[in-house]
Amino acid sequence: NESVSYTFEKPDKAEDLYSKGLKAKQSDSADTEVVTNTIAPIVTSITSNTPKEDGESSVKYTKKADKTEWYSGNIEFNISAKDSSDNKHHTGIKSVTATFNGTDVSKKLKGLPVFTAEKVESVNDITFNTEGLNLNEGTNTVEVTVVNNSGMSSTKKYEVYVDTIKPEVSQFEFKTVKSDVDKILSFLTFGIYNNEKIQVTVSAYDVNNAENAKSGIDYLEENHAEIQLYSAENQGKITAGEYSYNDDGVLSRTFTLACGKNEFNKYMLTAKAWDNVHNKSESYTFEKPDKAE
């Protein structure tokens, strides 16, 4: 026995395919027309920033040259997606998933709607942060995949960079302020100038990671690159000067010390440096010897 033929009619509007289903009509023909949406959904944006609840524990720096984003700690990502680049053809989003450095973090996504409750054409401000996840020193990769109710999908990749390596103070250079005796002094000869002003130039550099990359030490704004010089008993007699930065990635800053005879013997100098994401160097302390050699 042969059944009668059934033909599926394409609905007038694309959204009817999802909301109302396919309509069947009896026909004498054996032909069947099946309608489906082959336009893939898209991840419209992935952005990153320091987590709001993280306070000052993570610092962000964006390099001007290549626009790479560097962090010293945890990162928060913001995701947006929509069902189709063509606003007239939507079957609705079925799922949004994400990985971080290859690890599925979909359960960490905040702000997702219940996709089975209604047809969702777009999602915005979907967030997750890296708390509890392993951060790579250097490149860290987020991949977001969106799938619609027609089974079409697309994936977008986004990279950020992490620098947790401390910079290093590489040099102390001592000079007298007087131009007629403007020779470079080693720290051991520092003691012969016990009644003059002394200029101390402290140099520091950021350390490369395994990828031969770093956030750098050239961005001189608050909470970024910095060099400071300290004296426990004579801090008020240290005047901080200007910075200089060279092509080798070395940042220098010159300080002037008021070396009166009485307080000079008490000078013990400590320098610290911060890179562009404010990793702090070890403290480097130099104490004036009892006598010049």
What are these regions (language model features)?
Residues 1-293:
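Low-complexity, disordered linker/stalk regions enriched in Pro/Thr/Ser/Gly
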